[in-house]
Design a protein with these regions (language model features):
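Secretory-pathway/luminal and periplasmic proteins that interact with or process carbohydrate-rich
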Residues: 77-85, 142, 151-157
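PPIase-associated folding chaperone regions across multiple families
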Residues: 87-136, 140-146, 166-243
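Short linear loop/turn motifs
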Residues: 67-76, 149-150, 156-163, 239-242
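Residue-level marker of structural boundaries
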Residues: 16, 77, 150, 228-232
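N-terminal targeting/tethering segments
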Residues: 1-98, 102
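Short, positively charged
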Residues: 30, 161-170
Length: 243
């Protein structure tokens, strides 16, 4: 079952910053279209979380208060500046319309989904093992990406970027490596896949790296199958918008 309160949380946290930046649209039709669009996205995401909670229970996966606390602390440090708890609460309320309790619920849901996405994606595990084997054989990440094709995503920074760059945790991981060293696999900070990172160069505050990403796809595949088969019964009517 999807909690209506989760749907409202997701919707308000999405629409509030948009309205603060853009204001309400003058055209009533456009404004209604925007609201319906974000309501649809919020309901889809609430359904995703409900499925994740079900799979977490079936697979004995849990998220602890400590894990939620640690994630919130990381968010308070985004940009390299640690905000006070009161300052962070004000940001949540002013920018997203959320209380700390509501924010904790959103973090909890996202962590559950991350754990489930990782646990059920055997294809990603097998592909990561293949990448690890190729690294051990002496191959570079670029060569590995050329061999595996669209199964992986290869990226280069193309130069030095800030070590606090918002990039799924790659910059911070690269900062911990020696020049030319390739990291072990790690889960992206957004929980949507595995990364391998190679350090090209670094200074005290900047870093240049290359990376390979293996996306988690099994969770999305299952949700698409569920939606396409009509197994989701929605008690509130929000049409899918055609752009």
């Amino acid at each position: 079952d999807v909690r209506y309160s989760d749907y409202l949380l997701i919707y308000h946290s999405t629409i509030t910053p948009i309205e603060k930046q853009q204001g309400k649209l003058d055209n009533a039709k456009d404004n209604d279209f925007m609201e319906q669009h974000y309501k649809r996205l919020a309901l889809d995401e609430a359904e995703n979380y409900a499925w994740a909670l079900k799979l977490a229970k079936e697979n004995d996966l849990t998220v602890t208060d400590k894990e939620v606390d640690e994630t919130i602390l990381e968010h308070r440090k985004i940009g390299g500046v640690e905000r006070s708890e009161e300052g962070f609460k004000k940001i949540l309320e002013d920018n997203f319309g959320l209380t700390m309790k509501e924010y904790r619920r959103m973090i909890y849901l996202s962590l559950v989904k991350e754990k489930v996405s990782q646990a059920i994606d055997t294809n990603a595990v097998q592909l990561a093992a293949q990448v690890e084997s190729l690294i051990k054989s002496g191959k570079d990440l670029k060569a590995i990406s050329e061999e595996l094709g669209d199964k992986v995503l290869y990226e280069e920074t193309g130069g030095l970027v800030d070590k606090m760059n918002v990039d799924g945790g790659r910059s911070l991981k690269a900062m911990s490596l020696s020049t030319g060293e390739i990291s072990d696999k790690f889960v992206s900070s957004s929980g949507d896949g595995y990364y391998f990172v190679k350090l090209v160069a670094k200074t005290d505050s900047t870093v240049n790296y290359t990376s390979i990403k293996i996306s988690f796809t099994e969770f999305d595949r299952q949700m698409k199958e569920i939606r396409d088969s009509g197994k989701i019964k929605e008690l509130i009517k929000i049409d899918r918008q055609e752009s």
